């Protein structure tokens, strides 16, 4: 069986074709039950312009969700996706290119076991405890 993970990836819309090609090469977006689903997302944020006015902005992202995956380094598909994200990770303090790539992996024990980039700028991770 092995340890299973939820994998959440966010990339700028401009990078979608490149990641799709990598995922298609490894058959991660194919079939009746693909490893990943994806959706468009508009991130809202505010910034100050040159006149010190507060400006509302939006950034276009593509979000990929994978569930119940074996996400181990050393697997060819995992290494290909991780390498792509590591190439331009999101850093909220980088003013030159404020829109990078990010990923967060959550294990079946609800622990974050790996992350690339400042994922918390897009993903809000919560653990919910409910009564049965």
What are these regions (language model features)?
Residues 24-132:
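Charged interaction segments
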